[in-house]
């Protein structure tokens, strides 16, 4: 199993649940099998979209990207600019992103 060296965790907060649901639906249009293959070759190990549910009246998703290393991160940024950004730029959101280096990991 290949382990992640670098992780990006981003939250996007939407004005309404309707806009959030539109964004969620758009993911299958963005991440087609061909695009996923490009990201995989570039070194992205995993991506996860979560709908946050523990905050009342907050319409927020969490997006996790796991990369093989810093080079993979840099390469995947250009792919995100090519495939992802053009498809989501019309959404008005508050975006907070964080990059982390894996220090400790548990998996079963």
Region roles according to the model:
Residues 1-4, 40-62, 85-108:
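Glycine-rich beta-strand-turn "strand-cap" elements at beta-sheet edges
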Residues 5-14, 46-81:
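Short, well-ordered beta-strand segments in beta-rich or mixed alpha/beta enzyme
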Residues 13, 27, 35, 43, ...:
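Generic alpha-helical secondary structure signal
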Residues 18-46, 81-88:
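Short amphipathic alpha-helical segments
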């Amino acid at each position: 199993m290949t382990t992640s060296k670098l992780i990006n965790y981003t939250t996007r907060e939407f004005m309404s649940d309707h806009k959030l649901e539109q964004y969620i639906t758009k993911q299958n249009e963005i991440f087609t099998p061909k695009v996923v293959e490009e990201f995989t070759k570039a070194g992205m190990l995993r991506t996860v979209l979560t709908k946050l549910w523990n905050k009342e009246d907050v319409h927020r998703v969490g997006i996790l990207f796991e990369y093989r290393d810093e080079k993979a991160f840099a390469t995947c940024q250009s792919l995100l600019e090519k495939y992802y950004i053009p498809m989501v730029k019309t959404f008005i959101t508050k975006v907070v992103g964080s990059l982390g280096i894996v220090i400790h990991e548990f998996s079963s």
